[in-house]
């Protein structure tokens, strides 16, 4: 057991986690040169296309150290984006140490800090590594000082390497063996295994990635899932050397996968504990704190026949992505669908793309909203995650919106731009500290603004140098209103948005103008109105198409023309009463982009 090392690789986006993982696999001979590919752990098509890691992946390697001993390294490659921070915290729970990879050109960025603090809170040994030293812009000495100054870890002897060229990777492996402690646990104690991750395989059922804390698991053992009390037999058990390899036993401290033929998606939830059915342990391991979704949006299948498939797809996906939340919802305009909760906009995009690709669905998304706390006049407090659930205006005492604490790291040249952006987003400055050339600014910004396009705007206003990390802070009273969209006097529930009173006029106007572009002309006028309660704040009209009825009159009396025009007018009026307006998919997408330009 003292030859096992469990560690995660954490870093900011694009500091070279996945490339470093590739090198470690190559040096330890996990894959032959023929099977080796760039970013071999990013197995999803979506990950390769966007060049980001979405799912944490685990690998077991054997490494023969300089002292002649063979060590078993279990490591987990983690994502860097804020939206997938839940993946990171789960991966860290399975380790004793973490490699903090820092780009020697870019230096410390916001996610570096956030992930590092998560690791330190979990009592892990954090080992700093300076990557990309082959770049002409690299300045490892300055970055080592930065790490010490901003993060507070001694980085003077930090290992320097270049994952791309393979320079210094051997030193990294030696550092891992020396600095990261061996797992603790009792091989004789009753078995306890923590489920770190699980996914659904069409042939095997639920596959779970587990970390054995005490005891061991063997093939054909009878095991019990602690939260449900169900008993299963282990069919197959093994490790990843990125390839799935079967073994007969997983010992204390190891990380591996288990297949028990569980067909029910909720059979082995992430964060649960497995133990032996007979003589098992009494206590569950402390799992992970549940994350609260920050953004909610309605997802509806385009054709209502897909509803069943959509429900199954969401179930399978939520097994793989524990931070996804969903509940059924129905809308007058869109039929049956689900209200889904996500950790951020990127997460929402990724989930939607995965549903459309992996499960072959066509989906419509409604405008994303955050959760508001609403105090009613009778003292009741509601949590509202969709504009449709907001009570009537005269029942509301106050609406409180969620405020996010944003930690922004930015070079001092771009500080002005960033402050301007934060003020425009109704932010309040909390703190500002200078660390050499970098400035750490802390703002409290309403979550609704952060979620919409804060990240993109921050990147563009600072030429990509600013980095952001945010988390939910508190609810704060604010004058929020619901803007409804009416088509010919009928409310369309799926188009409503909740916005701040100051922005409501402009948002309403933008909304109706955008909608006007997308609704095709009909035989009668279509009035598109934005309203707050009964008060109309903006209107635009899609003009009717009309036939020239007096073209056939040649000369003749004016009363003849009047008669024809009047007849046409009455016909249009009748049409307007019974006609209904078809909303194209683009009209819904238009709403997503209101307020972005």
From Swiss-Prot:
Topological category with respect to the lipid bilayer: Peripheral membrane protein
Catalytic activity as recorded in UniProt: GTP + H2O = GDP + phosphate + H(+)
EC number: 3.6.5.n1
Cellular component GO terms held in the UniProt record: plasma membrane
Residues that hold GTP according to the record: 14-19, 131-134
Protein localization: Cell inner membrane
GO BP: any one term: positive regulation of translation
UniProt keywords, alphabetically: Cell inner membrane, Cell membrane, GTP-binding, Hydrolase, Membrane, Nucleotide-binding, Protein biosynthesis
tr-type G domain sequence ranges: 2-184
Taxonomic superkingdom: Bacteria
InterPro entries: EF-4, EFG_III/V, EFG_V-like, EFTu-like_2, G_TR_CS, LepA_C_sf, LepA_CTD, LepA_IV
Entries under Pfam families matching the protein: EFG_C, GTP_EFTU, GTP_EFTU_D2, LepA_C
Enzyme class: hydrolase
GO molecular function: GTP binding; GTPase activity; guanosine tetraphosphate binding; ribosome binding; translation elongation factor activity
Family: Belongs to the TRAFAC class translation factor GTPase superfamily. Classic translation factor GTPase family. LepA subfamily.
Alphabetized HAMAP family for the sequence: LepA
Function, as annotated: Required for accurate and efficient protein synthesis under certain stress conditions. May act as a fidelity factor of the translation reaction, by catalyzing a one-codon backward translocation of tRNAs on improperly translocated ribosomes. Back-translocation proceeds from a post-translocation (POST) complex to a pre-translocation (PRE) complex, thus giving elongation factor G a second chance to translocate the tRNAs correctly. Binds to ribosomes in a GTP-dependent manner.
Protein name, as recorded: Elongation factor 4
Source organism of the structure: Aliivibrio fischeri (strain ATCC 700601 / ES114)
């Amino acid at each position: 057991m003292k030859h096992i090392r469990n560690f995660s690789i954490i870093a900011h986006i694009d500091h070279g986690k996945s490339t470093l993982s590739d090198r470690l696999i190559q040096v330890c001979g996990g894959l032959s040169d023929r099977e080796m590919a760039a970013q071999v752990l990013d197995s999803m098509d979506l990950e390769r296309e966007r060049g980001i890691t979405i799912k944490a992946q685990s690998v077991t390697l054997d490494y023969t150290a300089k002292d002649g001993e063979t060590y078993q390294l279990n490591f987990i490659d983690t994502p860097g984006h804020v939206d997938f921070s839940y993946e990171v915290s789960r991966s860290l729970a399975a380790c004793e140490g973490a490699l903090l990879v820092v780009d020697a050109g870019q230096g410390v960025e916001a996610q570096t800090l956030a992930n590092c603090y998560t690791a330190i809170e979990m009592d892990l040994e954090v080992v700093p590594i300076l990557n990309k030293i082959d770049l002409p812009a690299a300045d490892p000495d300055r970055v080592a000082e930065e790490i010490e100054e901003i993060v507070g870890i001694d980085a003077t002897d930090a290992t320097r390497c270049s994952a791309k060229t393979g320079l210094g990777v051997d030193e990294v492996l030696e550092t891992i063996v020396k600095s990261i402690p061996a797992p603790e646990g009792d091989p004789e104690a009753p078995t306890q295994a923590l489920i770190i991750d699980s996914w659904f395989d069409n042939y095997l059922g639920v596959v779970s990635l587990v970390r054995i804390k005490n005891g061991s698991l063997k093939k054909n053992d009878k095991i019990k899932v602690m939260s449900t009390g169900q008993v299963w037999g282990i069919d197959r058990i093994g490790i990843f050397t990125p390839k799935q390899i079967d073994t007969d036993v997983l010992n204390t401290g190891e990380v591996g996968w288990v297949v028990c033929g569980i067909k029910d998606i909720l059979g082995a939830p992430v964060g649960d504990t497995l133990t032996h059915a007979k003589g098992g342990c009494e206590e569950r391991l402390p799992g992970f704190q549940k994350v609260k979704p920050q953004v909610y949006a309605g997802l509806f299948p385009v054709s209502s026949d897909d509803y069943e498939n959509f429900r199954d797809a969401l179930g399978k996906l939520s097994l793989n992505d524990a931070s996804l939340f969903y509940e059924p919802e129905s809308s007058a305009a869109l039929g049956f669908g689900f209200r889904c909760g996500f950790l951020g906009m990127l997460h929402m995009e990724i989930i939607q793309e995965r549903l459309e690709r992996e499960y072959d669905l066509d989906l419509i998304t409604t405008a994303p909203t955050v959760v508001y706390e609403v105090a009613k006049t009778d003292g009741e407090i509601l949590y509202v995650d969709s504009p449709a659930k907001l009570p009537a205006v005269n029942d509301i005492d106050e609406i409180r919106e969620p405020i996010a604490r944003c930690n922004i790291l930015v070079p001092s040249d771009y500080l002005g731009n960033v402050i301007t952006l934060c003020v425009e987003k109704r932010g309040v400055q909390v703190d500002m500290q200078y660390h050499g050339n970098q400035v750490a600014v802390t703002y409290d910004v309403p979550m609704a603004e952060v979620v919409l396009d804060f990240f993109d705007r921050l990147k563009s206003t600072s030429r990509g140098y600013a980095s952001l990390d945010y988390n939910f802070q508190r609810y704060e009273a604010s004058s929020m209103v619901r803007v409804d969209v009416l088509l010919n006097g009928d409310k369309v529930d799926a188009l409503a948005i909740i916005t701040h009173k100051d922005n409501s006029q402009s948002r309403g106007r933008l909304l109706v103008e955008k909608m006007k572009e997308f609704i095709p002309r009909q035989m009668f006028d279509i009035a598109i109105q934005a309203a707050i309660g009964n008060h109309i704040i903006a209107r635009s009209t899609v003009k009717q198409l009309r036939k020239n009825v007096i073209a056939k009159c040649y000369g003749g009396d004016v009363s003849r023309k009047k008669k024809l025009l009047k007849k046409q007018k009455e016909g249009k009026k009748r049409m307007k009463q019974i006609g209904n307006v078809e909303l194209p998919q683009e009209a819904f997408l238009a709403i997503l982009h209101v307020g972005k330009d």
